[in-house]
Amino acid sequence: MKLSNRVLEMEESVTLAAGARAKALKAEGRDILSLTLGEPDFTTPKNIQDAAIASIQDGRASFYTVTSGLPELKAAINAYFERFYGYSVAPNQVTVAAGAKYSLYTFFMAVVNPGDEVIIPTPYWVSYGDQVKMAEGVPVFVPAKEDNHFKVTVEQLEAARTDKTKVLVLNSPSNPTGMIYTREELLAIGNWAVEKDILILADDIYGRLVYNGHEFTPISSLSEAIRKQTVVINGVSKTYAMTGWRIGYAVGEAEIIAAMSKIAGQTTSNPSAVAQYAAVEALSGEQDTVESMRQAFEERLNTIYPLLAEVPGFEVVKPQGAFYLFPNVKKAMEMKGYTDVTEFTTAILEEAEVALVTGAGFGAPENVRLSYATDLDTLKEAVKRLKAFMEK
């Protein structure tokens, strides 16, 4: 059977592949410590679980919902935006999806025509480029330098812009680097996008997970002109420990949101009703558990960062948000005789029994990604093994 060129040209998600490999080795009895997947190790808070159970027991979750999401969930998203973004959104400016990843997909399918260019700063989350290609667009990768905390400048963006540029992808806090753009940096980028009539895709999924006094500023909150140029992608997965529930959403101008909902109507229809009722409680219920989880991530970061910096050949920029470390391992590879980062991470997996994610899938062939969304004992032991591997 001949598969489509579309799928043959598609890359496998390196994060999912690394996680699957680690699980397979664990199933064989290997003592694998996996630092691969980007999901909190906490269970979903009880008040959210209870809201989901109630929606099943009283029958509300038994039926289809509107494709773009429950009115109650849209109202909760509006209240959330009023609190954390400083502005209101109308129901027709919101569409809910089966995960933020699917919101991203419908956005690209809704706005990108064949040949349109999408600027993506590198390092980048692994699915951006392939989703652009699925929409027949052209990803244009702009390197964000480590000495600038993995952040691009307006000058770099302007140098990459052509008359085919349609979208700028902006992910802050970033997966995989954990960097956060300042208000001043975002204002400069936002004004540039407005002046050049370039859409901003703001992936804000890690916006509540910031540490050590750093602040998250939503680019869409900076001015009405920037807001109209921006589509915000967010969800409940990372902030509320709900990765398995698969609820994301997009907020933006009504025309784009309607187009995204139209695509969902011909593909997934509505997201799970049970998960939507759970998301209502997540966004509108008590938020104390969010802060306790954030504090736990902050403690892990502050504990593990100096330990990782002591691993020979690992050069680490301390992240400001999300829950990843993204060390440069060029020197480490040279010390161990490797020139390919994927081969290097494979050797670490086989010999040290620590599962990392190759930086190649993030557009960073000299880096690896470690998730610190796991307990401190596991993190300490993993770094201990990495150090022993490098010193052997």
Where do the protein language model's features map onto the residues?
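PLP-dependent aminotransferase-like
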Residues: 91-92, 109-170, 183
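N-terminal small-domain helix-loop-helix segment of the aminotransferase-like
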Residues: 2-99, 106, 282-285, 392
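Generic structural signal for small/hydrophobic residues in well-ordered secondary structure
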Residues: 18, 35, 52, 77, ...
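PLP-dependent enzyme catalytic core of the Aspartate aminotransferase-like
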Residues: 83, 159, 337-339, 343-356, ...
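Helix C-cap/helix->beta junction micro-motif
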Residues: 25-28, 135, 195-196, 226, ...
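Conserved core segment of the aminotransferase class I/II
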Residues: 224-298, 302-307, 311, 390
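Conserved glycine-rich beta-strand-loop-beta hairpin in the small C-terminal domain of fold type I
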Residues: 280, 295-304, 316-332, 366
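Active-site phosphate-binding strand-loop segment of PLP-dependent enzymes
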Residues: 144-214
